[in-house]
């Protein structure tokens, strides 16, 4: 590997660390997931969605009705953000770690990381466990992975 390639890898690693720090802040430091008046067990039950596409379906219904601009904006930001914010991870993981260039290994790694994030958000009450977030995050990472490989082949 030549000197320019090593510099690009090093720059990618630095960007990845900054990206991870920003994502940790977004995922764990913005707002708590707790609901006043509920004990811990009730909090857990209130902050979990295990039904695939339940939240997505509800958000899409709001988007189609266009009844409340604030709620509409929240739905669009949530759906789009859960995809768009994870595209960089899909680009950077295979760029930095060659073993992550295999799609199945990449997908398993990303699914494991996102599952851990969702579980931590739930049990720390710093968010919720929403299977739809996991699905949308993985879609974003997969789009980044595809983009990485398409761009890499054109070189």
Residue ranges and their predicted role:
Residues 1-126, 131, 145-155:
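Bulky hydrophobic segments
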